[in-house]
């Protein structure tokens, strides 16, 4: 009973907030589905400050005494920045006033007004019209008014007025107000005694309302949103958008969740010539479901304080390990286990760059033991350089690193690592071939802190790395499906030699086996980081073929396959792993194709020839139609780890109507990771989206189920939750222009 009473109170509060809202403009609406109200303004009309002589064209002219002239029959009254058309015009030259009658149309830089009659004081630049229709030039908006009072190009007063962004003849939504003030200088409108009408039915009364009349950002309350989920109950949010400056804004969102309590969220964004950033935070003083404080904070900043210098800051904090499960909005966010915190300061030279970094981590998943958590880099210094065509045509490559690792673990571990890796290569190139021999030396040294008794605290490893990379490009012309094409055949061979050195006593600060993809066939180390350098005596053989359009060079198909042949066992491994004895690697194949203008395909296969089985497979099929249709099919398979199918799409079923959905299934264990389905109607001035969603929030399989509804009144605001943003995350290609 108490829960039901809370829901009723929340509903009442939601509609009360609707009545107090001051609509802000944080995003520019799109009007591609709309027709034009009026023709584009001429150059003369775009002058915001009317001036200069008056020019009049008319069928007939009568001059009366006292300087009053009467023009009739298709009168065209022109002054730079102002046009007036009417059946009849009285021009009082001494007082510089104009009276117009019959099919009156007034135009200036900001609006068009059509009325039965009008009076204009040219000297004071003020005027009024009766029984008028008006159209805003800088915004797809129009309306009607019993009276219009114009004060230059700065302000317009409307009595008994309406306001809408819908096309002529369509009043899907409309504001009807006793009085409306349009401030063209600030780009806002003020309505008093306003009623929001949907399809000629008044849905609520607003005693005072501010709304945008152009595309500039405006401070004010955004339309409140409401929704319901099985995780947090019914909730309402009343975001306030603060346009602090042209380069800075903020959104402050008080939020109430019926099952948890009051919550505050906020975001600040800034953009300067030399830097940009975003600060986000949320705060729940007391979560009724957990009887505890909840909160999160993030700050991202990128800058260039001086030429060639750059900075990056990434700070992330969260109150507890379940925060993203309870308040995140996707499976990927809910499964976050570690948060990065880092500060980078770097310099970009001519062919080289340097970076200093401080990096730490917050481990959210407390089930991860201390010895398995990532090391902090306090600090790390990196220098990389590439200097082509130096002495005797040599290319010189250099990588250097000095880093101190630290981690809170028992017993404490850490230390300093120095890693230097210079390489020289001598490339030989012809129009259809290349051959590049290279030789490098990698020197790595450790100065360990709190080393266990009986172990060395100083370790080192110095090894040569020798490689030869060669390939060719063969090309032929052919005709397929009536199109002139070019096909290439690109064989490539890569030999790598690195002698063996026992590295089992070395710590593992940041090294791990590299995942095996096609590009890794040509890399000198099969491990990340510097803690392990592979021993190698191997030859990579690969071939790529492409289909290109003869006239444009556009790539229609690219297919590659490759494998490594090993001439000895690989004895350098990670701790606890056995040496590798296979005489060859897995076979790697990749394909990418543009099947038609709307269709594209990507695929990858990793085959184990020794076990005669597929180790990894992935395929992506994408369709993008001209009428808004989307289809994404993504299949992923990794033996003994995962097998997933992700299907999403958007299908137009009628004019402006579409269905949208996502089915994300774990085939390996039969779990439905996410199911989303909905319908949307999107027209010129309004849209509605209804979506049902269910997704897993944690490894235990707990689910969050929700129904989301969004009514978008374009140019005014959104009622309900931001369904559009959810669909952009869930359906690849949604929201992108066609």
From Swiss-Prot:
Q: Where is the signal peptide?
A: 1-26
Alphabetically list the UniProt keywords.
Answer: Cell outer membrane, Membrane, Signal
> Can you name this protein?
LPS-assembly protein LptD
InterPro entries the UniProt entry points to: LipoPS_assembly_LptD, LptD, LptD_2, LptD_C, OstA-like_N
**Would you identify the family this protein belongs to, as annotated?**
Belongs to the LptD family.
Q: Which domain of life is it from?
A: Bacteria
Species in which this protein is naturally found? Nitrosococcus oceani (strain ATCC 19707 / BCRC 17464 / JCM 30415 / NCIMB 11848 / C-107)
Membrane-crossing segments per the record: none
Mostly located where? membrane
General function of this protein: Together with LptE, is involved in the assembly of lipopolysaccharide (LPS) at the surface of the outer membrane.
Q: Which residues form a coiled coil?
A: none
Compartments, record wording: Cell outer membrane
Asked if the keyword Protein biosynthesis belongs to this entry, the reply reads: no
List the record's Gene Ontology CC terms alphabetically: cell outer membrane; transporter complex
Q: Does this entry carry the keyword Membrane?
A: yes
One GO BP annotation of this record: lipopolysaccharide transport
Quaternary structure, from the entry: Component of the lipopolysaccharide transport and assembly complex. Interacts with LptE and LptA.
């Amino acid at each position: 009973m108490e829960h039901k009473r809370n829901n009723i109170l929340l509903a009442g509060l939601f509609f009360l907030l609707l009545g107090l809202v001051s609509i802000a403009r944080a995003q520019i609406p799109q009007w591609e589905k709309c027709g034009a109200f009026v023709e584009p303004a001429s150059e003369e009309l775009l002058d915001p400050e009317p001036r200069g002589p008056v020019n009049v064209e008319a069928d007939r002219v009568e001059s009366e005494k006292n300087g009053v002239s009467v023009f009739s029959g298709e009168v065209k009254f022109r002054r730079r920045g102002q046009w007036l058309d009417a059946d009849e015009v009285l021009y009082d030259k001494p007082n510089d006033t104009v009276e117009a009658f019959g099919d009156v149309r007034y135009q200036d830089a900001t609006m068009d007004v059509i009325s039965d009659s009008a009076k204009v004081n040219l000297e004071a630049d003020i005027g009024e019209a009766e029984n008028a229709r008006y159209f805003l030039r800088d915004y797809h908006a129009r309306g009607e008014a019993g009276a219009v009072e114009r004060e230059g190009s700065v302000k317009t007063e409307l009595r008994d007025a309406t306001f809408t962004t819908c096309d002529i003849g369509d009043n899907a939504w409309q504001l009807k107000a006793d009085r409306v003030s349009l401030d063209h200088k600030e780009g806002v409108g003020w309505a008093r005694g306003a009623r929001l009408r949907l399809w000629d039915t008044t849905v609520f009364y607003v005693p005072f309302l501010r709304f945008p009349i152009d595309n500039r950002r405006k401070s004010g309350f955004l339309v409140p949103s409401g929704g319901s989920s099985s995780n947090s109950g019914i909730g309402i949010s009343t975001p306030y958008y603060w346009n602090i400056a042209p380069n800075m804004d903020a959104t402050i969102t008080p939020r109430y969740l019926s099952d948890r309590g009051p919550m505050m969220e906020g975001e600040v964004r800034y953009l300067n010539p030399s830097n940009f950033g975003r600060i986000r935070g949320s705060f729940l003083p007391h979560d009724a479901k957990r009887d505890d404080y909840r909160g999160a904070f993030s700050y991202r900043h990128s800058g260039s304080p001086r030429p060639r210098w750059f900075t990056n800051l990434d700070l992330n904090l969260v109150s507890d390990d379940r925060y993203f499960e309870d308040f995140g909005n996707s499976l990927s966010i809910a499964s976050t286990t570690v948060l990065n915190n880092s500060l980078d300061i770097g310099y970009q030279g001519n062919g080289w760059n340097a970076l200093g970094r401080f990096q730490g981590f917050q481990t959210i998943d407390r089930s991860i033991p201390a010895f398995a958590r990532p090391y902090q880099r306090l600090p790390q210094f990196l220098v990389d350089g590439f200097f082509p065509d130096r002495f005797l045509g040599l290319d010189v490559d250099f990588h250097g690193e000095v880093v101190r690792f630290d981690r809170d673990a028992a017993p404490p571990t850490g230390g300093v690592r120095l890693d230097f890796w210079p390489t020289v290569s001598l490339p030989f190139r012809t129009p259809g071939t290349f051959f590049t021999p290279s030789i490098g030396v990698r020197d790595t040294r450790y100065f360990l802190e709190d080393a266990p008794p009986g172990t060395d605290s100083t370790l080192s490893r110095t090894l040569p790395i020798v490689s030869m990379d060669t390939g060719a490009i063969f090309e032929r012309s052919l005709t397929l499906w009536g199109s002139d094409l070019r096909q290439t055949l690109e064989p490539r061979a890569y030999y790598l030699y690195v002698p063996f050195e026992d590295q089992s006593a070395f710590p593992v600060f940041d090294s791990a086996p590299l995942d095996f993809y096609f590009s890794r066939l040509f890399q000198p180390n099969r491990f990340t980081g510097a803690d392990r350098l592979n021993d190698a005596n191997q030859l990579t053989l690969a071939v790529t073929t492409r289909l290109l359009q003869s006239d444009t060079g556009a790539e229609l198909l690219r297919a590659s396959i490759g494998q490594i042949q090993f001439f000895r066992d690989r004895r350098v491994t990670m701790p606890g792993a056995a040496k590798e004895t296979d005489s060859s690697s897995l076979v790697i194949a990749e394909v990418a194709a543009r099947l038609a203008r709307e269709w594209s395909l990507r695929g990858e296969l990793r085959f184990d020839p020794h076990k005669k089985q597929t180790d990894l497979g992935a395929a992506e099929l994408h369709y993008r139609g001209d009428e808004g249709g989307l289809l994404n099919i993504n299949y992923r398979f990794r033996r003994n780890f995962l097998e997933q199918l992700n299907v999403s799409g958007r299908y137009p079923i009628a004019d402006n109507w579409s269905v949208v959905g996502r089915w994300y299934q774990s085939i390996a264990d039969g779990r439905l990771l996410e199911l989303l389905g909905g319908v949307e109607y999107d027209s010129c001035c309004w849209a509605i989206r209804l979506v049902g969603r269910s997704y897993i929030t944690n490894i235990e399989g707990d689910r969050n189920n929700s129904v989301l509804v969004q009514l978008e009144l374009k140019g005014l605001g959104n009622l309900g939750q931001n369904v559009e943003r959810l669909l952009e995350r869930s359906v690849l290609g949604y929201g992108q222009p066609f």
